[in-house]
Amino acid sequence: MNIVITGGAGFLGQRLAKALLHGSCPLAFDTLILADITPPPAPQPDARLQCLALDLSQPGAAERLIDADCGVLFHLAAIVSSHAESDFDLGMQVNFDATRQLLEAARHRAPGMKFIFTSSLAVFGGELPPVIDDRCAVTPQSSYGAQKAMCELLINDYARKGFVDGRVLRLPTISVRPGKPNKAASSFASGIIREPLHGKQAVCPVDAELALWLSSPAAVVSNFIHAATLPASAFGALRTLNLPGISVRVREMLEALRAVAGDAVAARVRFEPDAAINRIVAGWPGEFDTRRAQQLGFTADESFEQAIRTFIRDDMPQGGG
């Protein structure tokens, strides 16, 4: 049995691959294929690993990835929120068209395979109830959110028809990400923690009282793998789940940073409002009812302080400051 990760060169793809290759992983497989538009690095030496440079928007790309031996696909590849908003055509090609091609390849070449899709809080926007659950209607207010919402509906229908065993995971905003800022509207949610810990200044473009639904990378990767271990019957007819997270205001994030790293580190963050970013992020819900996911065994961080300490432990070997 083969496992495929699209977006395999990205931060989450690399973390997921490393976790899958670890001896404690509950998933047994023969080959792990990492695919991305740039050649994915091997997270560690392993004879089971294959790394492919592949543009999923090109004809035939999906068929190169999926054959009869493919048992699980983690579809992580995407054009992120602000980039998809500024380049509509590219967002549609990568976020929607490529997903449909992967679904078609799975339907015809590996029917019934587990198709695990990473969706987003951006499927929600506008006027929303105070707390969101799995059955709230999607109301995207951005091109990225619309593309993700269309994919959710398509995967649910492919699962209903028995073409694939679809599992849609709506990810919280991930914080704290290592590395450099990207074009996602939510990039600041890691930047206002990561940069000060590295001794750099950081800009927060949104209001201090804005509530975010957050998860650490470690919790998200653990939930990815858990999603692949569950039987199809666990999901029932509704194949979309809001993953557990923690609701934290930006002000509380900075208070947690201060508690972990001290006043001098927290003082490296300044507020410079960006109306476009604030509009996008403020449209995302800040609180979810994830009882269904929790009953299925998905988990969240204990606190945002814990998420910061985990980042320092895993991604800053010399410690923060």
What residue ranges belong to the model's regions?
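Mid/C-terminal beta-alpha module of Rossmann-like enzyme folds, strongest
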Residues: 196, 223-278
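N-terminal Rossmann NAD(P)H-binding glycine-rich loop of SDR-like oxidoreductase domains
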Residues: 3-24
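Amphipathic terminal alpha-helices
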Residues: 271, 285-295, 302-321
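Conserved Rossmann-fold NAD(P)-dependent oxidoreductase catalytic core, especially the SDR/UDP-sugar
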Residues: 100-141
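NAD(P)-dependent short-chain dehydrogenase/reductase
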Residues: 156-211, 217-219
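Active-site Tyr-X1-5-Lys
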Residues: 126-128, 141-167
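Substrate-binding strand-loop-helix patch
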Residues: 180-185, 208-222, 237-257, 310
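NAD(P)H-binding glycine-rich loop region in Rossmannoid oxidoreductase-like domains
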Residues: 56-94
